[in-house]
Amino acid sequence: MTFDKTIPKATIKRLSLYYRIFKRFHSENIEKASSKQIAEAIGIDSATVRRDFSYFGELGRRGFGYDVKKLMNFFADILNDTSTTNVLLVGVGNIGRALLNYRFHERNKMKIAMAFDTDDNEQVGQTTSDGIPIYGISSIKEKLIGTDVQTAILTVPSSKAQEVANILIDAGIKGILCFSPVHLSLPKGVVAQYVDLTSELQTLLYFMNQEQF
């Protein structure tokens, strides 16, 4: 299947939402869903749903709705959720520990396979209650040998983010989910997504203030 190469980032960011909604519809034994139903479930307008879906070819027929099981499988495929994706985590501070305790594999086919921190961190050498080993960062290349891990979650102080990113890239990591409020300098072939909790909270507060006027 050939997709439009100019898919907007806003559309791409909604793909996981569509996948989640179709999984929910499927669990509720809903076989067909209209663009209006999908839009209401996500909190957008139906025109946006139809426009988003148009980038991926013919996903449904006007007046007939969308086949829930078919679309659930479609989004699982393009989001690579048909087989388990192992990821690693660097930084076992407060955010890192919270993510280690979040059981991704129970909700999606993602699993934190190992975690890393500075070699002198007291947690190095330990294993979490879910069996995730914690290693010193200097051993990352060695630990990745023979694994399929190409994705990393980065939860380190901003001042260390680029340095650690360089270590990850040198070890063969191709994708980084960064919780540090900095923009990483990355070589071609390596991609990053950023989670800035402060920015998201400030945006929320802005919208809350707008509602008061």
From Swiss-Prot:
Question: Which residues fall under the DNA-binding region feature?
Answer: 17-56
Q: Which GO terms describe its molecular function?
A: DNA binding; DNA-binding transcription factor activity
Cellular component aspect of the GO annotation: cytoplasm
Kindly give the InterPro entries that the UniProt entry links to this protein: CoA-bd, NAD(P)-bd_dom_sf, Rex_DNA-bd_C_dom, Tscrpt_rep_Rex, WH-like_DNA-bd_sf, WH_DNA-bd_sf
Biological process according to GO: negative regulation of DNA-templated transcription; response to redox state
Keyword list (alphabetical) reads: Cytoplasm, DNA-binding, NAD, Repressor, Transcription, Transcription regulation
Record-listed NAD(+) binding positions: G91, V92, G93, N94, I95, G96
Q: Where in the cell is it found?
A: Cytoplasm
Q: Which Gene3D superfamilies does this UniProt record tie to the protein?
A: NAD(P)-binding Rossmann-like Domain (3.40.50.720), Winged helix-like DNA-binding domain superfamily/Winged helix DNA-binding domain (1.10.10.10)
One Pfam short name: CoA_binding
Q: What does this protein do?
A: Modulates transcription in response to changes in cellular NADH/NAD(+) redox state.
Assembly description:
Homodimer.
Question: What NCBIfam families is this protein classified in?
Answer: PRK05472.1-1 (NF003988), PRK05472.1-3 (NF003989), PRK05472.1-5 (NF003991), PRK05472.2-3 (NF003994), PRK05472.2-4 (NF003995), PRK05472.2-5 (NF003996)
So what family is this one in?
Answer: Belongs to the transcriptional regulatory Rex family.
Name recorded for this polypeptide: Redox-sensing transcriptional repressor Rex
Q: Which organism is it from?
A: Streptococcus mutans serotype c (strain ATCC 700610 / UA159)
Q: What is the lineage of its organism?
A: Bacteria, Bacillati, Bacillota, Bacilli, Lactobacillales
